[in-house]
Regions:
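N-terminal secretory signal peptides and thylakoid transit peptides that target proteins
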Residues: 1-12
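N-terminal cap/lid segment of alpha/beta-hydrolase-fold proteins
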Residues: 18-48
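Short amphipathic alpha-helix adjacent to the substrate-entry channel of hydrolases
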Residues: 69-87
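Alpha/beta-hydrolase active-site loop
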Residues: 100-119
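Gly/Ser-rich "nucleophile elbow"/oxyanion-hole loop immediately N-terminal to the catalytic nucleophile
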Residues: 114-130
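Hydrolase active-site cap/lid region
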Residues: 143-187
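Short beta-strand/loop motif that positions the catalytic acidic residue
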Residues: 209-211, 215
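C-terminal catalytic histidine-bearing segment of alpha/beta-hydrolase fold enzymes
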Residues: 224-266
Length: 266
């Protein structure tokens, strides 16, 4: 964990600190998809020769560089144990050079597209690929699905910031949505139209929208609004679950989360 990540974790509630400060698990391989230091992915592989289904996973952290892909490593390892390869994407985040919305979204597309050469090398089944993401990563997973840059069987946003206008109104993350997009919905409506999952509907791949009812970081209201607006989404409310329970394999709800992530792949 970097010093920046440690300081960011110290600002979280105690239950969240317990999770995000866990020592990260080592992936089978780390593969660059670009020249910037943040343009890489960690690949977690299941046992066996394959071909393996694959999950493109996008971590959260309010799009800020204080949070890295490392805190998603336990989720990735758990999914690999269950039989899926996981391509855990890192990407430029706010605070990194070139990390405005254009740079961040560009990284997500290029990182996802790089799954093709990765699949050829590691015998992954490109007909059984889904995207999943947590918090800000859930927004990016939905955005990726809307671009149709890669063929996805489904998309699973976990506690996602799936309504950027609502997130701006609530000033989530200290007003991070305005920082990400360079202003309010009234000031830069075209940027919200390009980035907000609510404004990108309909999204073709089916969506399983998971959210904890006790999430005090990203309220379930955002997922409820998105699932209601989407004709291709099902909301899965997880009673009593907090924000980080959805990516913590030690949590009571993890079996339900894993089931929904892998439902289209086996």
């Amino acid at each position: 964990m970097t010093r920046r990540s440690f300081l960011a974790a110290a600002c979280l509630p105690a239950f969240a600190q317990d999770f995000v400060t866990l020592p990260p698990l080592k992936a089978n391989d780390r593969i660059a998809y670009g020249k910037a230091a943040q343009q890489f992915g960690d690949l977690f592989l299941p046992h066996g020769n394959g071909p393996h289904p694959a999950v493109i996973f996008i971590h959260g952290g309010f799009w800020r560089n204080a949070y890295t892909l490392e805190h998603a490593s336990h989720l990735c390892a758990a999914l690999a144990r269950a039989g899926a390869a996981v391509w855990n994407l890192e990407y430029r985040r706010l605070g990194d050079p070139g990390a405005d919305w254009a740079g961040i979204s560009d990284d997500i597309v290029h990182g996802a597209e790089h799954l093709v050469p990765v699949a050829n090398r590691y015998n992954l089944d490109l007909k059984r690929v889904i995207a999943a993401g947590h918090s800000a990563g859930g927004q990016l997973a939905l955005w990726l699905a809307a671009q149709m840059a890669v063929d996805l069987r489904g998309v699973v946003p976990l506690a996602a910031i799936s309504d950027l206008r609502r997130a701006y109104a609530l000033q989530l993350g200290g007003g991070v949505v305005g920082e990400l997009l360079g202003g309010s919905p009234d000031r830069v409506p075209q940027r919200y139209a390009a980035a907000d999952p609510m404004e990108l509907l309909p999204i073709s791949p089916p969506q399983r929208v998971l959210h904890g009812t006790a999430d005090n970081i990203v309220p379930i209201d955002l997922s409820q609004r998105f699932a209601k607006a989407s004709k291709n989404a099902k909301l899965v409310a997880l009673p009593g679950a907090g924000h980080f329970d959805l990516i913590d394999p030690r949590s009571k709800i993890w079996p339900k989360v894993q089931e929904n992530i892998l439902r289209w792949q086996f």
